[in-house]
Amino acid sequence: MLIACQENGNLLNAVEDTVNPLDKFLCPACLEAVRFKKGRIMRPHFAHISLKDCHFYTENESAEHLNLKAALFTWARKSNHAVQVEAYLPKLQQIADLLVEKQIALEVQCSSLSQKRLKERTDSYHQHGYHVLWLLGKKLWLKDSLTNLQKDFLYFSQNMGFYLWELDDKKQELRLKYLIHEDLHGRAQYKVQSFPFGQGSLLTVLRTPFQQQEMTSFLAKEDKNICRYVRQQLYYQQPKWMKLQAELYQAGDNLLTKTASDFYPQVHPVCASSFCQIFQDLTPYYQQFSAYYKKAKNKNLQVLYPPIFYAKIFGSIYDRIGETEEILWQNKEMKLKKNILGI
């Protein structure tokens, strides 16, 4: 922990205050004794003498967690934001890693937690009028595929689709992974944007997914041997594919008779029964995405766009029919693609 209370009630911040290690200190939340530590590996911090009576700090912090909290606090201060590190929120009975401008809670999550606990903490923030952003440490970084827990850290915007935030203590940067999609193998495909600690306004960086910007896109990685992959999944009785095969069989169809083009598009937006951080209805996005690629003539190529791309195409021509619809569709699609590709 980076904050401790002196016997006179004053709060000390180990990031910016001069601390006398001989003084007595208390945890601001549970008021139990803590000691000041300063070593070669861990940055200067406070630690409970005993955690058994504290319900707010359940385990000793890692060096990564301490360093990232300190880095964000310094960045927020440099950005002239009103910021508290380890802000105790009595009504919530929890501590926010950082509280920016009194309403934005930044949670640095370096270790795994249950989806139930994540939802409880997220809901608690929202019910009390706070906006919470979860920033992920190394153990929770998105790599080849999304876990169920990582899906509950996803956010959504029209400009960047599904996205999440990562913190890199070694590289000293905040990372935005966005336009996150999944292919038929269950692998994640996405773009990455990095922001060095301390450069620019912290809140401006965190608002990136909602700022006005040029639309971006990327070419999906497709499996040219998708039919062989599906056969293998059925041979090994993979539950997901066995379920789909059963559904098709009931309809008089069969996965084994499909061609590669039948599996187009191979890359789709992330799906889940629910999302912990997303509250808007995503049905229009899913429908527009599906309709766009269903209409595509080239089944050998899939370019992925942000949700606003599909929304703009369908916004004015979705209900039109016949030749007029086709002309408008082609003209609007070409114009949007030119804007994206900078042609």
Describe the residue ranges of each PLM region.
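Short secondary-structure capping/turn micro-motifs that flank functional sites
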Residues: 91-93, 141-142
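Conserved catalytic cores of phosphodiester-cleaving nucleases, focusing on short active-site segments
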Residues: 72, 98-114, 125
